[in-house]
Amino acid sequence: MEVCGFNELKLVGASCATIYIDMKHSSNDNLTYDIIIIGAGIIGLATARTLLIQHPNLKLLILEKESDIALHQTGRNSGVIHSGIYYKPKSLKALTCLEGYQLLLDYVKEKNIPYELCGKLIVATETKELDSLKTLYHKGIEHGLTEIKLITGEEAKQMEPNLTCLQAIWVPYTGIVNYKEVCKRFLLDIVSMGGQIKC
């Protein structure tokens, strides 16, 4: 079986953080890595980068089945930087979203990766949606998004002339970024810290 350029990949021994691999075409029959990460999308690359920052002596390998990084979901999405407004306040998902949001903004600023905090409008177009919109607004405030605003349909139309709604939440935290560019920078960081990738 061919896996990302390997003629054969066998797990010949594994412990909690060590995996031994046997590659038939390798001059070294027993390459050893502390960590092997499968997949070079944003999650695989971010995980690898974080591990190498926290444990600089790790021998780390990323295996990617494609010819390049970020060719699937990571490179084929709308690039939204999420605020976490829809998550249950104080839940693990909400807290990690807030933490990840700030880490991402800090990173793109540090690396001069283009991004835009363009904001978004969450709208109620029917009377029956107004209560849900207000509930979401209060959840957003509880979540720590103190700059969100509950605005009228007319105020929303001033922001977006093609929009017709009764009421809206303005979420200035939401942004966009090219996650493929973020991944390219992650990979440069990983390689500079001694990590390896095999595509």
Please report, for each region that a protein language model flagged, where it lies by residue.
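N-terminal amphipathic/hydrophobic targeting modules at extreme N-termini
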Residues: 6-7, 11-12, 17
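Glycine-rich FAD pyrophosphate-binding loop
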Residues: 53-73
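A short, basic/flexible loop-to-alpha-helix module at the beginning of a structural domain
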Residues: 20-32
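Beta1/beta-strand and adjacent pyrophosphate-binding region of the FAD-binding site
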Residues: 30-41
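Dinucleotide-binding Rossmann-like beta1-alpha1 core, especially the glycine-rich loop
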Residues: 79-155, 159, 165
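Helical element adjacent to the flavin cofactor pocket in flavoenzyme catalytic cores
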Residues: 172-199
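N-terminal Rossmann-fold NAD(P) dinucleotide-binding loop
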Residues: 44
